A protein has these predicted regions:
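Conserved N-terminal Rossmann-fold NAD(P) cofactor-binding segment
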Residues: 5-41, 48, 53-57, 61
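Short, surface-exposed alpha-helical segments at coil->helix boundaries
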Residues: 6-14, 90, 117, 138, ...
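A generic secondary-structure signal
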Residues: 15-19, 96-100, 147
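Proline-centered flexible-loop/turn and helix-kink motifs
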Residues: 21, 25, 105, 127-128
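Rossmann-fold dinucleotide-binding core
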Residues: 108-177
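Long, compositionally biased stretches enriched for glycine and/or charged residues
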Residues: 147-320
Length: 320
C-alpha cells in the first residue's frame, strides 16, 4: 500500500495487518511512501487515489456558484471531475502510467479513482500499459429488485454504459422481461413509496435516488432505467435547478448532490476516518467492527479471472 500521508499510511498498515492476523490470512503487508518503491515488479496495481480529497471539486463548485450556477455544476450533477479535479487526477495517473511502463510493464492497473472512464481511456491511449476501469454503480439495480419484491437469484440484468452513466438495457425475471413489473410498480405503488418513511427518512446518509421520481422521469424519457450514479448524471436538467425542485424529484433532502445530501456524504467520510483511527488507537478488534462479508466490488473477481482463469470479461475494449 502507498500513501504520501505518513500518519494515514501507518493507520492503514496497522488496520490491514491486524485484520490479516485476526482472520488468520497469511498475507504480508508492506507500506510505502514512494509509489515507485511499491511498483517495482508488481503484477496488479489498484489505484484509489483522490488528489486533495474533495478539495479541488469544492473549489470548482465555489467558482461556478459565484457565477450563478446552482451547486456549482449546473446540470452536470455527477461528473465529479469536470475541470480542476480532473486535471489533478489525470496528471497523477500519467505519472503512475509512466512508472508502470518502466517498473512493471506487464502489470494490470485496476483503475478505481474518478474520473474512471476518462482516466482509463486517457492512459490506455497514450501509454503502453494494461488497464481496466471499475466502478460499483451498477449494483444499484438491486434496489429495484428489492422494491419490486423479486427473488434476486432469479433476476438477470444487463447494465451498459460508462462510468456514472449506465442504463439497465436488459431486465429479466424467471426468464421473462421484467420491465412490465417495473411499469406496474410505477402505476400502482410508486406514489405510496415516495410518501413512505423508508424513502423520506431525512436521517439516512445516502438518499434513495434509484427509485426516486427523478429516476422514473428519466426512465420515461429514455425508455430504459438509469442505474446508480446515472440517476444523478443522466436525469433531466429540469429536476436539478434549485433545492426546492430537487426535493420534489429526489426526496426530502434533495438527493445525493443537494447541499444537504452532499454534506451528509462528506460528513460520513469524516466519521469513517474517525472510527478507523479509534480502532487503531484502542486496539479494538477490526473484525468485530468490520465483519467479513462477500464484496460486491470487482477488484478481486477481476484479478482472480486473470490469475486463475475464472470466467470474467477482461477485454479492455469492453471494460469500463
Amino acid at each position: 500500500m502507498v500513501d504520501i500521508d505518513e500518519n494515514r499510511l501507518h493507520m492503514a498498515e496497522a488496520l490491514v495487518t491486524r485484520y490479516c492476523r485476526e482472520s488468520k490470512m497469511n498475507l504480508k503487508v508492506r507500506a510505502f511512501k514512494e509509489r515507485r518503491d511499491a511498483l517495482e515488479g508488481a503484477e496488479y496495481v489498484i489505484c484509489a487515489v483522490k488528489i486533495g480529497g474533495y478539495g479541488p471539486l469544492e473549489k470548482e463548485r465555489e467558482i461556478a456558484e459565484a457565477r450563478g450556477y446552482y451547486r456549482g455544476i449546473g446540470d452536470r450533477v455527477s461528473c465529479y471531475y469536470g475541470g480542476i479535479g480532473a486535471y489533478h487526477q489525470i496528471h497523477f495517473l500519467e505519472g503512475v502510467a509512466r512508472d508502470m511502463q518502466e517498473l512493471c510493464p506487464d502489470a494490470w492497473l485496476v483503475q478505481t479513482a474518478n474520473p474512471v472512464f476518462e482516466g482509463t481511456n486517457y492512459i490506455t491511449r497514450h501509454y503502453n500499459i494494461k488497464a481496466v476501469g471499475v466502478c460499483h454503480g451498477h449494483n444499484a439495480y438491486k434496489e429495484i429488485i428489492e422494491e419490486l419484491g423479486l427473488e434476486q437469484d432469479k433476476v438477470n440484468v444487463e447494465v451498459v454504459g460508462f462510468n456514472h452513466c449506465v442504463f439497465m438495457t436488459g431486465f429479466r425475471y424467471k426468464g421473462k422481461d421484467a420491465y412490465p413489473l417495473l411499469d406496474q410498480w410505477i402505476e400502482e405503488k410508486a406514489e405510496a413509496y415516495w410518501k413512505s418513511e423508508r424513502y423520506m427518512d431525512p436521517n439516512r446518509v445516502f438518499s434513495k435516488d434509484q427509485m426516486s421520481p427523478g429516476a422514473i422521469e428519466a426512465y420515461r424519457l429514455y425508455g430504459v432505467m438509469p442505474i446508480g450514479d446515472a440517476v444523478r448524471s443522466a436525469t433531466p436538467w429540469w429536476t436539478h435547478t434549485d433545492f426546492e425542485t430537487k426535493c420534489r424529484w429526489y426526496g426530502k433532502n434533495g438527493g445525493f448532490d443537494s447541499e444537504i445530501g452532499w454534506k451528509s456524504y462528506l460528513d460520513s467520510k469524516k466519521d469513517i476516518q474517525a472510527n478507523l483511527s479509534e480502532i487503531v488507537e484502542s486496539g479494538r478488534s477490526v473484525m468485530e467492527a468490520y465483519r467479513p462479508s462477500e464484496t460486491t466490488e470487482q477488484h478481486i473477481p477481476f484479478i482472480d479471472s486473470i490469475a486463475n482463469g475464472v470466467g470474467e470479461d477482461t477485454d479492455p475494449e469492453r471494460a469500463e
